């Protein structure tokens, strides 16, 4: 199986998550939600975390666990998302959004990082900002909130069918959804 995945390493080794069910390589956290619209065709090339869970007859939440990295001040616990995982309100599980941020926040992470290759489209950054605020606000009302970091690619890419441009617009969000810092677009 091929995964579109975040690979997490520390001191030259991929990080294991001991509580993780079998089925993934060390240090890997695959994309949970695959887009299949416009020029996206993830399911054609990759196996998603939802597909892995279904294939093993398990709940997808079993795989949405934090990574832990030792630091000089203690253990830093963080969660990862890939691109489409942010747009969770468009994907439901048991009639509720499949909110990986919420699951990670419930599991005591210190931060969540969304690593994206999200192409530029007109006013998409405003839509993304509203979506992040909505997700963080929903969790904050439950008394669960952590900072969120959106890290987007900059540049251009030819996928064989389309030429896509990526504007960056990396943004750090406070736990309440307000912007803490924002990088200049197109220059990262």
Which functions belong to the PLM regions below?
Residues 1-188:
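Enzyme catalytic cores with a strong preference for nitrogen-chemistry domains
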């Amino acid at each position: 199986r091929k995964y579109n995945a975040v690979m997490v390493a520390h001191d030259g080794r991929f990080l294991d998550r001991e509580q993780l069910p079998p089925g993934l390589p060390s240090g890997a956290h695959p994309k949970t939600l695959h887009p299949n619209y416009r020029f996206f065709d993830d399911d054609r090339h990759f196996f998603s975390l939802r597909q892995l869970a279904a294939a093993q007859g398990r709940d997808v939440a079993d795989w949405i666990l934090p990574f832990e990295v030792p630091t000089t001040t203690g253990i830093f616990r963080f969660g990862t998302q890939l691109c489409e995982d942010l747009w969770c309100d468009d994907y439901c599980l048991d009639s509720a959004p499949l909110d990986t941020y919420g699951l990670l926040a419930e599991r005591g992470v210190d931060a969540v990082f969304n690593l994206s290759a999200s192409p530029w489209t007109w006013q998409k950054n405003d839509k993304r900002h509203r979506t992040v605020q909505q997700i963080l606000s929903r969790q904050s009302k439950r008394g669960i909130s952590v900072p969120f970091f959106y890290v987007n690619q900059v540049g251009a890419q030819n996928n064989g069918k389309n030429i896509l441009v990526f504007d960056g617009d990396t943004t750090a969000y406070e736990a309440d959804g307000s912007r803490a810092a924002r990088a200049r677009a197109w220059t990262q």
